[in-house]
UniProtKB/Swiss-Prot annotation:
Its main location: cytoplasm. IGPS catalyzes the conversion of PRFAR and glutamine to IGP, AICAR and glutamate. The HisF subunit catalyzes the cyclization activity that produces IGP and AICAR from PRFAR using the ammonia provided by the HisH subunit. The gene is hisF. Pathway: Amino-acid biosynthesis; L-histidine biosynthesis; L-histidine from 5-phospho-alpha-D-ribose 1-diphosphate: step 5/9. Its EC number is 4.3.2.10. This is Imidazole glycerol phosphate synthase subunit HisF. The keyword Lyase applies. It is an enzyme of class 4 (lyase). SUPFAM superfamilies: Ribulose-phoshate binding barrel.
Length: 258
């Protein structure tokens, strides 16, 4: 059995790490490289960096900090933000990223997923999916351009359908960003995770809602996700990664201890 992964998420805007609530009202957390180094030292299994306004601004993630992160840490990391071509992805990988993640660009041009997988291998290609549960219609809908409140909009895709589509096109991993839960620390959306797990054949990463060690345990034990991503609880040191991993191991989760 593969070990489950604990993955701090660093949202980047204007060269700094920020964090919002439900993808809005972002506050500055700190500088990129010191935070990355801290999480690596604390025992994170990998890191994810989202340049949250790159897609909405029509640009690609800033490569200068990617190289600095690669020089500072010795754990895998994934980079996302406005990657629209094989060439742009290749440059980020050449600067030291281990994986690249696409979200809004995949919605705009789904064939990009296949081209990236064919060029770099599925193990390098992550698709991020921003999903919002609409209580009125009791449906889960994919959103795009979520890094910019003014430009965020719903797509025509139901979440489960898009999950199956990106797998068919070559996604090697899926990060499910549950927008309703983002930053509120009330727990991952287990209902949605379980539904997506049933149709997801590739590694599935839960994102949005972690507020206590029990929330990570529930995602692993009930929804059988492969990794759990979180931001504010790590940024604000509400949860220590080493302590979290020991708690999970004591509760039967296969995890790499620090």
């Amino acid at each position: 059995m593969l070990a489950k992964r604990i993955i701090p998420c660093l949202d980047v805007r204007d060269g700094q790490v920020v964090k919002g609530v439900q993808f809005r009202h972002h506050e500055i957390i700190g500088d990129i490289v010191p935070l990355a180094r801290r999480y690596a030292d604390e025992g994170a299994d990998e890191l994810v960096f989202y340049d949250i306004t790159a897609s909405a601004d029509g640009r690609v993630v800033d490569k200068s900090w990617v190289a600095r992160v690669a020089a500072a840490i010795d754990i895998p990391f994934c980079v996302a933000g406005g990657i629209r071509s094989v060439k742009e992805a290749g440059l980020l990988l050449s600067y030291g990223a281990d994986k690249i993640s696409i979200n809004s660009p995949a919605l705009a041009e789904p064939t990009l997923i296949t081209r990236l997988a064919d060029r770099f291998g599925v193990q390098c290609v992550v698709v991020g999916i921003d999903t919002w549960h609409d209580a009125a219609s009791d449906s889960d809908r994919v959103y795009q351009f979520t890094g910019d409140e003014a430009r965020t909009r719903a797509t025509a895709w139901q979440t489960a359908d898009w999950v199956q589509e990106v797998q068919r096109r070559g996604a090697g991993e899926i990060v499910l960003n549950m927008m309703n839960q983002d930053g509120v620390r009330s727990g991952y959306d287990l209902r949605q995770l379980e539904q997506i797990r049933a149709v997801c054949r590739v590694p599935l990463i839960a994102s949005g809602g972690a507020g206590a060690p029990e929330h990570f345990l529930a995602a692993f034990s009930q929804a059988d996700v492969d990794g759990a991503l979180a931001a504010s609880v790590f940024h604000k040191q509400i949860i220590q990664i080493g302590e979290l991993k020991r708690y999970l191991a004591l509760n039967g989760v296969e995890i790499r201890l620090c």
